[in-house]
């Protein structure tokens, strides 16, 4: 059966809100295994249904997230992203109107330097974004002011991003597991994401 979890199912909590950003061709519910772990620890979860399957160009995707963020009154949020979602998240951090509201980005398996699997024949498709020579990707890479607020978590081997997920100036972590999708459902990777989200969380401890 198709998952029909409504977007507001996990929007309550007393910790810093988390906006979840899936990868390309992934619906927001693809992030549910990780979102549920974060919500159980008090983080409201804000998905962005307007991204649909996240196949739009980078700037258009970031604008959709900016619109969604504008609908929430939380002064600060943390972004938790998978794959292309990490690129969208960094683009959002550079947004002139809402970028300042992003406390940090925790990205899983995000190809900040593109993927060596990208082929020239894909250049005019949504997958063309992942070419290391793509103009939108290289422009994003040149913007390094926000990198210190990014945690890039990569697998020991990623079949979709074999060249790795290292981002200059970011906090880079390599998991002791392989796979592009496995970290989303791995308890140890989920706990690591939670730990890194907490580094950006300035909310007072509940009950204090």
Predicted regions and their residues:
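A broad structural signal for short, well-ordered beta-strand segments within beta-sheet-rich domains
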Residues: 14, 102, 169-170
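Generic secondary-structure transition motif, activating predominantly at the C-termini of alpha-helices
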Residues: 2-6, 69, 73, 141-144, ...
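Serine-dependent carboxylesterase/thioesterase catalytic core
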Residues: 18-29, 33, 37-148, 160
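Generic hydrophobic alpha-helical membrane-segment signal
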Residues: 5, 10-11, 97, 122, ...
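Short secondary-structure boundary/capping segments
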Residues: 9-10, 69, 141-144, 163-165, ...
